[in-house]
Amino acid sequence: AWVCGNSCVWKGSEKTPLCAIACQSIWNEVSSEMNLPSGLSIIISGGRDLGEKMSEDKRIPVMSATGSTKMGKAVGTKVASRLGRSILELGGNNAMIITESADLKMTVTAAVFGAVGTAGQRCTSTRRLIIHESIYDRVCGAIINAYKQIIIGSPLDTRNHMGPLIDLDAVNNYLESLKAVDKKGGKFLLIGKQLEGTN
């Protein structure tokens, strides 16, 4: 929207309101330095009900949403019912293609960070690797070795590579996904366990 000169009213996830506020603060600072008109970016904060109201609002000609396929179907249907347009990024299983000539060190760093950065909870997290068969074993070995070095803990501690999942629902969804992989005959290259903490 901004690149095309349009204003944008946006709502972040209700699970991460402080991240949305921080992003808006950065936008405010940059737009002020660039002498852009105020009001190009407006944040609103709330839950699912607010998102539903936005999808029903005829003053919003184009609605963009990122999230689950279930959410996207609901948003797309509501926006279409008022003849609005929608852009939906849904339930992605983002793939990274690793070619025969790939730089192995760079590839492993990108693949692992893409998967564990923000504990794999962003819409662009690496979920699948499509690896050229000639380097498959080397890539798998290097990734297993990299995962063995991941330090999990408080995201406020810069020595850690990965923080916790955002809430119990996220933990349960993750565990269910692992069960589904096992049930479908998937092979685990590295076995871990759910961590427990004091708080």
Language-model regions, residue ranges each:
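ALDH superfamily catalytic-core signature
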Residues: 29-30, 70-199
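Rossmann-like NAD(P) dinucleotide-binding subdomain of oxidoreductase/dehydrogenase enzymes
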Residues: 1-106
